């Protein structure tokens, strides 16, 4: 599902190879969700994990029931997890190691995607519990703004860092702004 929070809804598209475009299939749900992911939890229940506007980089993570057969989600959150800091926003798809689900989350305490937290996901009595088991931040000066995506699939890990495209110009503008 592409990021589409500003439109107020999430849509599913199908790639049209003949016309080389994405065709709208239907709206999954009408909520301003950010970096929403569809996950199959241990019991084969499906959920949408997400944060939402107006505080996408905050500390509240929501879980919505999802019907994979009809590709629709419920508008009312099943559960909300509140974190002590701004680490709620998804940073990619959840994944399993053995029977244990993990979720990559963005550390948004300094800025959007400052780093990645890997969180263990459990459900106890119908309530979701998350525990950070690892975190990492960029030590590469070329990607000093951080990491905002972590995906793992078929033995490959993809991490997306972000940076200023023209760091020298940004540094010069920063110096000039202090001269006022």
Region spans (language model):
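Carbohydrate-active catalytic/glycan-binding domains of CAZyme proteins
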Residues: 1-180
């Amino acid at each position: 599902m592409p990021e589409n929070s500003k439109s107020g809804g999430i849509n599913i598209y199908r790639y049209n190879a003949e016309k080389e475009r994405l065709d709208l299939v239907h709206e999954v749900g009408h909520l301003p969700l950010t970096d929403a992911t569809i996950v199959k939890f241990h019991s084969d229940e499906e959920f949408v994990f997400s944060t939402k506007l107006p505080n996408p980089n905050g500390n509240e993570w929501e879980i919505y029931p999802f019907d994979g057969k009809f590709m629709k989600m419920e508008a009312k959150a099943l559960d909300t997890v509140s974190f002590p800091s701004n680490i709620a926003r998804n940073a990619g798809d959840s994944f399993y190691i053995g029977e244990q689900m993990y979720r990559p989350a963005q550390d948004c305490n300094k800025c959007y995607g400052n780093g990645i937290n890997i969180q263990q996901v459990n459900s106890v009595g119908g309530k979701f519990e998350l525990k950070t088991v690892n975190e990492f931040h960029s030590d590469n000066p070329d990607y000093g703004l951080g990491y905002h995506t972590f995906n793992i699939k078929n033995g490959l890990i993809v991490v997306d860092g972000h940076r200023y495209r023209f760091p020298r110009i940004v540094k010069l503008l920063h110096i000039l702004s202090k001269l006022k």
